[in-house]
Amino acid sequence: MNRLYPHPIIAREGWPIIGGGLALSLLVSMCCGWWSLPFWVFTVFALQFFRDPAREIPQNPEAVLSPVDGRIVVVERARDPYRDVDALKISIFMNVFNVHSQKSPADCTVTKVVYNKGKFVNADLDKASTENERNAVLATTASGREITFVQVAGLVARRILCYTQAGAKLSRGERYGFIRFGSRVDVYLPVDAQAQVAIGDKVTGVKTVLARLPLTDSQADPVSQAASVETAANPSAEQQQIEAAAAKIQAAVQDVLKD
């Protein structure tokens, strides 16, 4: 759970549909008995589609998490169309049996949200990234890296829901959106990001690590930095012995040259 979404297990976007299906199923059951079976099947399908279970979230600062459940359909170097820079592109396709809530792949601050109208071709196709209805979130991670994650509507999905805006701070795994009934999410990362998945891999939202973003020296673990400084300031006994031996050799060479 998080501060913006305190209702796990069943996504709130599905409450009206599930409630309506349950009421209709009960009504038809009382009137028509077994003829209500299709309505019960629909209600059960809606329950599984709108499930939104709580999950453990990896806290490795280098890890970029999968924002959704699904299957990897793209891992390639591409152009981020929202920043006009080269990037590592990773795309996840969601079928109707996957969890469809979207969650932040990293601790980040949203800098811009861009919505584009478009078509509704099969989200499994490459052209869906540029032709379909889509909503892009441009953000800067806690370590200062720029990332973009894009909700893409699919053949059946006709409504993208995004609950974040420019200036908002998202925690890794924090819920920020939802797409109904099959869709896709594109993630654009800096080119030095190291992909941890391959095409065809099945991923689990916020549990699977899509890629790792290397940290610069200035962003390294302060404990490690302190240890390095201490080592430099206090050389080991072995280092001291080596330096003493080098000084003796240098002195001996100078004596020979004087003679």
Curated annotation (Swiss-Prot):
Cofactors, names only: pyruvate
Pathway(s): Phospholipid metabolism; phosphatidylethanolamine biosynthesis; phosphatidylethanolamine from CDP-diacylglycerol: step 2/2
Site (Cleavage (non-hydrolytic)) residue list: 182-183
Chief location of this protein within or outside the cell: membrane
Lyase among keywords: yes
Location of the active site: 183
Protein name: Phosphatidylserine decarboxylase proenzyme
Gene for this chain: psd
